[in-house]
Structures are given as structure tokens and as C-alpha cells.
Amino acid sequence: MADMQNLVERLERAVGRLEAVSHTSDMHRGYGDSPSKAGAAPYVQVFDSLLAGPVAEYLKISKEIGGDVQKHAEMVHTGLKLERALLVTASQCQQPADNKLSDLLAPISEQIKEVITFREKNRGSKLFNHLSAVSESIQALGWVAMAPKPGPYVKEMNDAAMFYTNRVLKEYKDVDKKHVDWVKAYLSIWTELQAYIKEFHTTGLAWSKTGPVAKELSGLPSGPSAGSGPPPPPPGPPPPPVSTSSGSDESASRSALFAQINQGESITHALKHVSDDMKTHKNPALKAQSGPLRSGPKPFSAPKPQTSQSPKPATKKEPAVLELEGKKWRVENQENVSNLVIEDTELKQVAYIYKCVSTTLQIKGKINSITVDNCKKLGLVFDDVVGIVEIINSGDVKVQVMGKVPTISINKTDGCHAYLSKNSLDCEIVSAKSSEMNVLIPTEGGDFNEFPVPEQFKTLWNGQKLVTTVTEIAG
């Protein structure tokens, strides 16, 4: 039955793609489309099928979830439509120089920044894991600037998203299937894009070999007030005609120069003899008359950036937060505080610690999970956690469990010391993209023995699969 269901789903997706290719004239109107799709490049039509398939499904489910997820999805959709406009341009024009290419990529780059900024501005969102999954992977749209391996770049971004989509699945798999479908739809965008790149743009964005050199995107998304503005000013007067006499003089001088060169050794007959009294190293008086020697040109050095005369405005300091919001303890923007304590905890509560610097925090009682995000020099002591303690985007963090914790996750962190209790020796340490990690195990005397977490690995192909082992470094 499961095989039959999978077959039906594959057939439905195939039909959807065929319909997209056949009826793309009704889609994405105003984003580089011509009235007729008969002349559209094949890889543009296939990209349209991606928009009509996984992207449309992702937008549909995001709309059903609503809120921040829907707003985020609309931003992603805009980025994909900008990318489609670039594909249309590439199919019709030749590749421009690098400095001009960066101008063509600027709209996509700005849209990527907007998607990432939205996540940063909504850290208190209940759907923060959804926003993080999108924010961590949206840079996959930059594959158009990646050569010679754009496909692996997209896969890397997709893998980054899975760190957060796994958390969405864990949270909603038994609660709301809609969020599970959302994860499948979103990740399928990037897996389908990888297959698309492999077929049409294996070593980089494929540009036309004919046509004009690309200067601007063909059919950028038009805003609602696109037609209300005044017409652009007329072009300025043409530059004055270049004098032809200078060109003829230059040509004549060049001819004379070649004529002299062609004389060969006889050219030296026109040289004058220089006697000793005309040489500065033989006649000191002549050297004194000529004044100080001019120094040669200085070697090239990169221009130093000009310093602004006006002082830079001070960075706005965010207010410190320590409060219970629903079931979430928020500890944010704490600096140089050494006595923070959370006491009234419950099993269903979670703690989110964000942008705390040189601060120590103690969490008493039993809590569901703890997340440490973007913190520096943080000391965290807690009793019991039934879920996971996660440290991400941080540095020089020390955590100590007094009771029990099943899992400690360390991601994108440089410097982490995890002090385990005797009751938590079976704790799993999961790490990724991190360094300088140490686990400290208690001894009978009350001290701790320090054990570094491996950071270097060796992977070999054994004929059937990849086998990865820790690399021991003798120091």
C-alpha cells in the first residue's frame, strides 16, 4: 500500500510539471515573461515547473500556517522570481564582465538579506525554528554566482536547513501534520533545484553564446506603483566629437618611431659623444648645479579608506530581559551579570538565552530544554533538563549539569566546556562546525578530568560505504 501511495504521489508531481510547462503563460506574469512561451529557453521552462511544483506547495502550506511563516514564504517567493528573471536574461544575453555581473545579482542578494533579517527581528516568534530553517538555507539562491560547482553549494545550504527542520519535525510530528508537510515541501525546493542545476547548469549559470551582453534583468518584478512615477529625464547632450588630428599625429609619430627602430645599429651614429666634463659622477661641480636628485615613483600601496570626520553614532544597546513569556524563559542582552537565577520552573517550560556576555545564570528545578544562542563568556548551571541543551553561534561557554540531561548539542561554537554530573555520564554530546570543545567528567575526589571532543576526522571508502574515524594528532 505504501509503494502504491508513493507511486501515486510521483505521478501527481509529474503531471503537475507537465501542466506547468504547458500553461506557464498564466504564471509569474510581470517577471520576465513574454506573451508567448514558445521562445522561452528550455531551462527557463523547467524552472517554471519547479515554481509550479515544490514552491507552490511550500507557499500553500505556509499560507495555511499563517503568521511569520507566511510572510517569510512570500519573501522567499520574491527571491525565486528574481532568480527566474536572471535565468531569462542569461538565456537571451551573453555573460557580462564581473563588475557588471555583480549589478545583475544585486537584487537577489538584497532579497536574501531581507529573508535573513526577518528571522533576526523575530527571535521571539513561536515559529522561530521555521524561520531559522529558511534563513539558514536561503543563500542557496546564490548558486547563480557559484562556479564550477553550484550544485554542491545548494546541497550544503539544504543541509544547514535540516538542523532546524528536524526540530520542527520533533515538535510537530505528533501534534500537527501540516508542519511536517511544510518541512517536506520546503526541503524539496532545494533537492529539486540541485537536480535542475545538475541538468542545465552543472559548472555554473549557462549564458547565451549570442545576443547582446547582459546589462539588466529581463522583466524585474514591478511594484504596485510602477506606472505612477514621472518619466525619466531625457539623456544629456552627446559628448563632443573626438578630434581626428590627434589620431593622425599619433599614427605619424608611431610610424616615425618604427622607422628609427628599423635602422638597426646605424641608429647609434646619431648619438653625441659625452665627454668627462659633462658627466655628473666625473664633474662634482655639475652635480651641485643640477640640485637634488628627484626620487623615483613610490611603490604601489592600496589606498587607505578615508576616515569620516563626523563621529559614528553609538550602537543602540538592546534592553536586558529576564522574563517568563508563556512557557518560555527569555534571558537576553545581559552583560557582566554574575547572579542571575531562575527558580520557579516547570517541566513544560523552556529557556532561551540570547546575546548574553560575561554573565552567569543558574536554572533551578526541572525544565524541558535550554537554548544558548549568540552568547560570549557565559556560565550556565542547571539542575535537570528532560530534552536537550543546545549551544549555537556562541563562544567561550561553560555549562554544568547538577542533575541529569540526555543530550547536549554544540553547533557553530568556538570554545565550550561541558561539566557533567555523575547522573549524566550517559549524556550524548552532538557537535557540528565547532572547535575547542571539552567534556569534564567528575572524579571520586570531587575534581574533574578533562576530555577534548574530536574535531578532525578521516573518511575512507571501503568498497560499499564511507567509513569515518577520528584522526588522532600527536602533539
Swiss-Prot record:
The keyword Phosphoprotein applies. Keywords: Acetylation, Actin-binding, Cell membrane, Isopeptide bond, Membrane, Methylation, Phosphoprotein, Ubl conjugation. The keyword Phosphoprotein applies. GO terms for cellular component: cytoplasm; plasma membrane. Residues 216-255, 278-318 are annotated as: Disordered. Belongs to the CAP family. This is Adenylyl cyclase-associated protein 1. It comes from Pongo abelii (Sumatran orangutan).
